[in-house]
A protein has these predicted regions:
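Alpha-helical transmembrane segments
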Residues: 31-59, 343-346, 350
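A hydrophobic alpha-helix feature that marks transmembrane segments and, especially
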Residues: 33-42, 266, 270-308, 316-321, ...
Length: 412
């Protein structure tokens, strides 16, 4: 250890109480940043995975402009060709086909406009959580033809129960009248009010017959094995689709294009969180600034003596910066270790938010949240603390360079 480092280490502990308080403030800020960033990233991942498992999937293959217009004529014409491509991509965990249309649905008492989704029961169970959301009755099977699943809120609005029949009336792909009668086999509840109020699911084969789809579908829904692989999968699928030479090229959309509202909510929450973190770091920076300004005032005479016997201002500045960075690094390392341990505990056991379950359900989140510790969440916050505290310590350290030895030694 150099002489300057030894001097800095001894100077740090001249006022033990002040040093410990400063280190604790830095450690607490680092701990809080590690945990809160991990909690934010974990909640975002939960929101994304919950939403894609209920509605969109991580990726979808669609006809161009179908996402904007929802025109029943804009179809994926030969889905089995797409299936052959998807089976060759190892990062794809599962996929399924869906048909989408709007219709009027009537019970004996009421009529509502709903979104009708045709699903492949076997594949859908691997792609979405719909099967686990059934609260009454059973999920669809491959043998079902005229059965349907409806949301709990829709069932309440229509005043129907299991076994009741519903009349579905819409327009087919060829412009013909699409009409059928289905029997309620299951009632689901996702916790997302808009979805539970206006969704009905029927077997894909029935959907294709009723809506004159001629074997076509509207969506090929893909689930990736990890959120990290979505961009790579999207690129692979787009490259493979370009080789099909379709007259009307298909589009590959990822989750943030399919759910722009969710993406915007995450971005807004992240920005508000960053503002809070910045304020926290600034508080710590002012604490460091205050500590070193007080140290300079208390040690002005000492600095004057050192400069009088030949110590250069640059060396004094170096010693002061070593002092500040040593305290900062002790606090940051302590904060990262403790914050990571706390985060890992809650990453396994979760945090109970059952008291706010009704609010969280609007975002498709259950009453228990799990932080997600990563290198980004563990390092980015403390790194910001390090940079800003260095800048805060730079001012008092440079202030020493302007001291005049004679005047400094007269200070009492």
């Amino acid at each position: 250890m150099s002489i300057d480092a030894k001097m800095a280490w001894r100077n740090i502990w001249r006022n033990t109480r002040r040093t410990i308080l400063t280190i604790c403030a830095i450690a607490f800020a680092s701990l809080l940043l590690v945990f809160m960033l991990s909690f934010q990233f974990g909640s975002y991942e939960t929101m994304i995975n919950t939403s894609v498992k209920i509605q969109t999937g991580h990726l979808q293959i669609q006809a161009q402009e179908f996402q904007e217009k929802k025109n029943i004529r804009q179809v994926v014409p030969e889905p089995e060709k797409i299936a052959a491509i998807l089976k060759t991509i190892p990062s794809i965990a599962a996929f399924t086909f869906r048909g989408q249309a709007f219709a009027l649905i009537s019970s004996n008492e009421r009529t509502y406009g709903v979104a009708v989704t045709g699903i492949d029961p076997d594949r859908e169970a691997d792609v979405s959580r719909l099967k686990s959301l059934i609260r009454e009755g059973d999920f669809l099977t491959a043998e079902d033809t005229d059965q349907a699943l409806i949301g709990r809120l829709l069932a309440q609005n229509l005043r129907v129960k299991l076994g009741d029949e519903l009349t579905v009336l819409g327009q087919g792909r060829d412009g013909s009248i699409a009409a059928t009668v289905v029997q309620i086999k299951g009632i689901f509840s996702s916790g997302i009010s808009d979805f539970d109020r206006a969704a009905i699911h029927i077997p894909l084969k029935t959907f294709q017959e009723v809506y004159s789809m001629q074997g076509a579908v509207h969506e090929v829904v893909v689930i990736a094995d990890s959120l990290r692989n979505i961009n790579a999968i999207k690129t692979s699928v787009e490259t493979a689709l370009s080789s099909l030479n379709e007259k009307k090229p298909l589009m590959v959309l990822d989750w943030d294009e399919l759910m722009p509202g969710l993406r915007q909510s995450i971005e807004m929450d992240l920005i508000s969180g960053l503002i809070f973190y910045l304020l926290l770091v600034l508080v710590v920076a002012f604490s460091i600034l205050n500590t070193f300004l007080m140290a300079i005032f208390e040690r002005t005479r000492e600095f004057g003596v050192l400069m009088a016997i030949g110590t250069t201002p640059g060396r004094l500045t170096k010693v002061l910066l070593i002092e500040s960075m040593t305290m900062t690094l002790i606090g940051i390392v302590t904060g990262i270790i403790v914050g990571s341990l706390i985060t890992l505990y809650f990453q396994v056991h979760g945090i109970d938010f059952s008291g706010a379950s009704e609010l969280l359900s609007q975002f498709g989140i259950t009453g228990r949240m799990y932080p997600k510790l990563s290198w980004l969440s563990a390092i980015s916050g403390p790194l910001a603390v390090l940079m800003i505290t260095f800048l805060a310590a730079l001012y008092p350290a440079l202030k020493v360079r302007r001291l005049q030895p004679v005047e400094a030694m007269r200070t009492t």
